[in-house]
Swiss-Prot record:
A Pfam family reported for this protein in Swiss-Prot or TrEMBL: Cybc1_Eros
Bilayer disposition of the protein: Single-pass membrane protein
Species, as recorded: Bos taurus
Protein name: Cytochrome b-245 chaperone 1
Residue positions where Phosphoserine is found in the record: 168
Localization per Swiss-Prot or TrEMBL: Endoplasmic reticulum membrane
One BP term from GO: innate immune response
InterPro entries listed in its UniProt record: Cybc1
Sequence similarity: Belongs to the CYBC1 family.
Primary subcellular site in the record, as a coarse category: endoplasmic reticulum
Length: 187
């Protein structure tokens, strides 16, 4: 699953994502290698601790991040939060949280993009496109599986932000007037 809907009201959409089964399985597998190496080796206690600690470090490094997206119409903002256990351990609890805040009015489109996933092939991610031309992924990592799972989330966001509605004739005439008044058209 790409993201889960935590809450959905007319003014607030809260989406969450936690590490998946593949990520947790990899953590348990790598940590098991370290524990087995420590248990079956005839080395000193220091080396055994090194085996377990090293494998724990590699296992946590491969763990996916916890991510959430909060679209709030009452504040007019979207908050994208990311929590990384790996960064939290590296900085000794000083970092680990990333947060991006964007105005809802700046979002112009929501797309699904295909991304190459190392070792596994291709995955899909929802991308928010802004009026400035800048784009930002909804999550930091793509999800493997069916594109339709990711498209459901993209459609949910598009519907919530009412981006699917066509421009009114007044907005169309204003945009064509502003194009005609551009400085390059003057003679």
């Amino acid at each position: 699953m790409y993201m889960q809907v935590e809450t959905r009201t007319s003014s607030r959409l809260h989406l969450k994502r936690a590490p998946g089964i593949r990520s947790w399985s990899l953590l348990v597998g790598i940590l098991s290698i370290g524990l087995a190496a420590a248990y079956y080796s005839g080395d000193s206690l220091g080396w055994k601790l090194f085996y377990v600690t090293g494998c724990l470090f590699v296992a946590v490094q491969n763990l996916e991040d916890w991510e959430e997206a909060i679209f709030n119409k009452s504040t007019g903002k979207v908050v994208l939060k990311t929590f990384s256990l790996y960064r939290k351990l590296l900085t000794l609890c000083r970092a680990g949280h990333d947060q991006v805040v964007v105005l809802l009015s700046d979002i112009r489109d929501v797309n699904v993009e295909e991304e190459k996933v190392r070792y596994f092939g291709k995955g899909y991610v929802v991308v928010l496109r802004f009026a400035t031309g800048f784009s930002h992924p909804l999550t930091q990592s793509a999800v493997m599986g069916h594109r339709s799972d990711v498209e459901v989330i993209a459609k949910l966001i598009t519907t919530f932000l009412e981006l699917h509605r066509l421009e009114s004739p007044v907005e169309l005439s204003q945009s064509s007037d502003s194009e005609a008044d551009s400085p390059g058209d003057q003679s």
